[in-house]
């Protein structure tokens, strides 16, 4: 088994910011993010065909901005602005588009996509499977396994880098100076300005 877990929330915001506004002519509904999201999802599935192609796939979404972390620490991500008004009606449409691809769309109240991705990744690894996490989220790098049973794929284009960049234990070490299992300790010591964690 080779499980592909896509950080759907990340894909939504990338698609939203990458494309100009687009609305449906019949009713003016914003759909630019949905168009970009589906194009990205289609490209991903096409790019990963071959001998090492995933046998299973799911797209994981944040349920909402509120999670068990905000209950424990109210300042968690408190500095982030709310989602743009024209993006909000596109959230359910991206889930529907995912299901239209016949791909499971998974989210759970009070949990972030990262939590669900980590749970599924560890369960698949423990069952002897291989896991690819499609995300550029540094928080997920702690899941990368030196034996390659869990690795990441960053599909965000960056100058001077390939369009699809694999992240294994070596890349995690290059970024943090520690092995993946120590990333959580580095973040605990350094905090995380992105998530407003001191």
Short names for language-model regions:
Residues 1-75:
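Non-catalytic, usually N-terminal nucleic-acid engagement modules in DNA/RNA processing proteins
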């Amino acid at each position: 088994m080779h499980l592909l877990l896509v950080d759907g929330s990340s894909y939504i915001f990338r698609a939203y910011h990458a494309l100009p506004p687009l609305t449906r002519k019949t009713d003016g509904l914003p759909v630019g993010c949905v168009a970009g999201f589906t194009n990205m999802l289609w490209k991903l599935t096409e790019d990963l065909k071959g001998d090492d192609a995933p046998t299973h796939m799911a797209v994981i979404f944040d349920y909402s901005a509120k999670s068990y972390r905000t209950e424990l620490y109210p300042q968690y991500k408190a500095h982030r602005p709310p989602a743009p008004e024209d993006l909000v009606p596109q959230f359910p449409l991206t889930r529907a588009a995912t299901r239209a691809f016949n791909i499971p769309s998974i989210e759970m109240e009070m949990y972030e996509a990262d939590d669900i991705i980590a749970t599924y990744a560890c369960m698949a690894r423990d069952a002897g499977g291989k896991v690819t996490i499609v995300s550029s989220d540094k928080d997920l790098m702690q899941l990368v396994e030196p034996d390659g049973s869990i690795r990441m794929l960053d599909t965000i284009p960056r100058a001077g880098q390939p369009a699809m960049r694999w992240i294994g234990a070596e890349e995690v070490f290059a970024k943090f100076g520690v092995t993946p299992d120590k990333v959580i300790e580095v973040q605990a010591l350094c905090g995380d300005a992105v998530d407003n964690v001191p």
